[in-house]
Regions:
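N-terminal, polar/charged subdomain of small-to-medium soluble alpha/beta proteins
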Residues: 2-77
Length: 77
C-alpha cells in the first residue's frame, strides 16, 4: 500500500493511501467497499480517486470487479 503526504495552502497536511476494493457486482460497489472499510479505521477522509479498474475472470466468467482507490485523509500528528 503506497502512502504519501500532501500539504494544502491552509497549512493542513493530508496523507494519501492506495486501496483495492472488490465486488461481485460492479466497479462502483468495489470502490464503495474500499472507502467503507477505510472509514472504519481512518478519520477525516477527504477525497477518493479511482485510479484503476480491472476484473478477475475465470473460464470466461467475471468473478470479481476490482477498483484501485487513492484515498486522502487528514494527517494528525
Amino acid at each position: 500500500m503506497a502512502t504519501r503526504a500532501k500539504s494544502t495552502s491552509t497549512g493542513s497536511v493530508y496523507r494519501i493511501t492506495e486501496l483495492v476494493g472488490t465486488s461481485k457486482t460492479s466497479w462502483e460497489e468495489a470502490a464503495r467497499n474500499a472507502v467503507h472499510t477505510a472509514s472504519q479505521s481512518l478519520r477525516e477522509l477527504r477525497v477518493a480517486e479511482i485510479t484503476k479498474m480491472d476484473m478477475v475472470i475465470e473460464n470466461g466468467r467475471v468473478l470479481a470487479f476490482r477498483s484501485r482507490v487513492s484515498l486522502s485523509f487528514k494527517y494528525e500528528r
